[in-house]
């Protein structure tokens, strides 16, 4: 081809955004955006075809080529499939100060404080609970501060069975603006895009009546967000870029708020898909145990 194009990833296709003429096997591009990952491509009768390895043009103008190393394998812990944006961060902080409480009285009088959320984040969290010495029938998330008790999902895991324990949803009866889509049941519906939005700015709460005292070993929760964290029960598939195409590293059904992959080629470009729901997905590299989206 007389021309080479540079493409960027646009969920889920590569879209050419710049071109240059090839002279003596060299194509020179000018005025490219920095801190961007590009893929060299050409147009053929079969459509867009990669003609080189993806690379990052850093903020300092350095070119860093991305090549998967199949000889050096790594483990990978994944929490998201799409980058985090400011509008999500502005909501997620509301989880700060919330408390998980347990009691055997429906009024929650003399309740035991199980855990206080002292740091905010946009991904799900697991709380491992040591043996308490007592079992409790009523468990809840209580938010004393100005947050409307915003939470997307709560899961209570029983100690003996190590399985999710399901009871009767309890909590404040109404939501903000009386929106039926944000009632207390939304905190237990398995959908990360729905959330409880208490009618009270402070003092909101939501939880479970298990019908009898239970021993909970773990609480898993996800703050209100964008639905792009890992959803329990959803099926995911991880891909990596090799030999000019995406190759699968296997499917998993999420049992908690993160995915664990082993024997992953290191130094590469990756792509996580939710096969159950959702459309927003983004490529990433993996640096120092963290996903870096492009």
Per-segment meaning from a language model:
Residues 26-39, 43-45:
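Short Pro-Gly-centered beta-turn/loop motif in secreted/extracellular proteins
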Residues 2-3, 35-36, 41, 60-62, ...:
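Glycine-centered loop/turn motifs
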Residues 16-17, 53-55, 115-118, 128-129, ...:
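Beta-strand-rich interaction surfaces with strong enrichment in secreted/lumenal proteins
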Residues 22-31, 257-262:
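Short, surface-exposed beta-strand/beta-hairpin micro-motifs centered on an aromatic residue
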Residues 2-13, 93-98, 151:
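Short, ordered, surface-exposed loop/turn motifs in non-cytosolic proteins
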Residues 11-24:
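Short, acidic Ser/Thr/Gly-rich low-complexity loop/linker segments typical of extracellular
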Residues 70-110, 121-251, 255-294:
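Aromatic, loop-rich ligand-recognition surfaces of beta-strand-rich domains
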């Amino acid at each position: 081809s007389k021309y080479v194009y540079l493409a960027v990833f646009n969920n889920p296709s590569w879209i050419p955004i710049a071109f240059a003429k090839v002279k003596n096997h060299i194509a020179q591009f000018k005025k490219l955006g920095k801190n961007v990952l590009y893929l060299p491509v050409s147009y053929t009768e079969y459509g867009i075809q990669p003609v080189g390895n993806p690379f990052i043009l850093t903020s300092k103008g350095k070119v860093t080529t991305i090549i998967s190393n199949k000889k050096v394998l790594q483990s990978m812990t994944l929490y998201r499939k799409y980058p985090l944006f400011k509008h999500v961060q502005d909501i997620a902080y509301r989880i700060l100060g919330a408390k998980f409480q347990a009691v055997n009285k429906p009024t929650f009088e003399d309740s035991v404080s199980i855990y206080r959320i002292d740091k905010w984040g946009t991904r799900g969290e697991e709380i491992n609970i040591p043996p308490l010495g007592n079992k409790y029938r009523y468990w809840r998330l209580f938010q004393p501060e100005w947050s409307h008790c915003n939470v997307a999902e709560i899961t209570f895991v029983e100690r003996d069975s190590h399985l999710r324990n399901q009871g009767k949803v309890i909590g404040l009866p109404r939501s903000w603006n009386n929106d039926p889509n944000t009632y207390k049941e939304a905190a237990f519906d398995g959908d990360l895009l729905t959330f409880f939005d208490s009618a009270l700015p402070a003092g909101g709460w939501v939880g479970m009546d298990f019908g009898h005292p239970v021993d909970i070993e773990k609480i898993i929760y996800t703050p209100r967000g964008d639905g792009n964290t890992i959803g329990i029960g959803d099926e995911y598939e991880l891909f990596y870029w090799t030999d000019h195409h995406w190759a699968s590293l296997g499917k998993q059904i999420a049992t908690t708020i993160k995915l664990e992959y082993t024997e992953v080629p290191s130094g590469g470009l990756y792509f996580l898909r939710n096969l159950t729901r959702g459309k927003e997905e983004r490529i990433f590299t993996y640096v120092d145990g963290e996903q870096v989206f492009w």
